[in-house]
């Protein structure tokens, strides 16, 4: 691989990681200001459960790109906060399905509004066509590596 390509690759990785971190920090700050006792990591699990609850911890691992110990810890903490509950699967008692509590359902609207607000701030001066190109390129990179 030519040296200049490697440096380009470092740049892309740096920029995407830096942007992702900046968005996460801003969203966390908004959660804190709004009095939501929730980390970005916990929110990402809730986000996937809002899309489809009653999924296994393994499915949460796949959806969030986290390993089993990380998801177990996050679900443990969400359970302590009374935001999720584990229910043994009727088909396979070794599997726990994760369901939202009423308290978690109440957080959905406010937290999603804050997330949308944060993304709007992040993309405020970016033209729509550049956003589309960026999404395409990142999808290709992901597809190449999965």
Positions of predicted regions on the chain:
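A cross-family signal for key residues in well-ordered alpha-helices
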Residues: 47-48, 62, 109, 135, ...
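Charged, amphipathic alpha-helical coiled-coil/dimerization segments
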Residues: 76-136
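N-terminal positioning helix adjacent to the helix-turn-helix/winged-helix DNA-binding module
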Residues: 12, 41-42, 103, 130
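Canonical helix-turn-helix DNA-binding module
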Residues: 40, 53-97
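C-terminal regulatory/oligomerization modules of transcriptional regulators
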Residues: 1-7, 128-146
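Alpha-helical linker/hinge and terminal dimerization helices associated
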Residues: 19, 23, 30, 64, ...
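N-terminal leader segment of winged-helix/HTH proteins
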Residues: 1-34
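N-terminal helix-turn-helix DNA-binding core of bacterial DNA-binding proteins
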Residues: 21, 25-66
């Amino acid at each position: 691989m030519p040296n200049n390509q490697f440096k380009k690759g470092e740049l892309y990785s740096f920029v995407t990681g830096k942007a992702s971190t900046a968005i996460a920090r801003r969203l966390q700050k908004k959660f804190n200001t709004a009095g939501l006792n929730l980390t970005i990591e916990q929110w990402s699990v809730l986000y996937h459960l809002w899309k489809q609850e009653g999924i296994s911890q393994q499915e949460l691992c796949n959806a969030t790109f986290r390993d089993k110990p990380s998801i177990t810890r996050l679900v443990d903490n969400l359970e302590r906060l009374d935001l999720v509950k584990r229910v043994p699967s009727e088909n396979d008692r070794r599997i726990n399905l994760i369901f939202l509590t009423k308290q978690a359902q109440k957080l959905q609207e406010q937290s999603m509004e804050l997330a949308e607000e944060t993304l709007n701030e992040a993309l405020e001066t970016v033209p729509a066509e550049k956003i589309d190109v960026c999404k395409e390129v990142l999808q290709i990179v992901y597809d190449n590596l999965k």
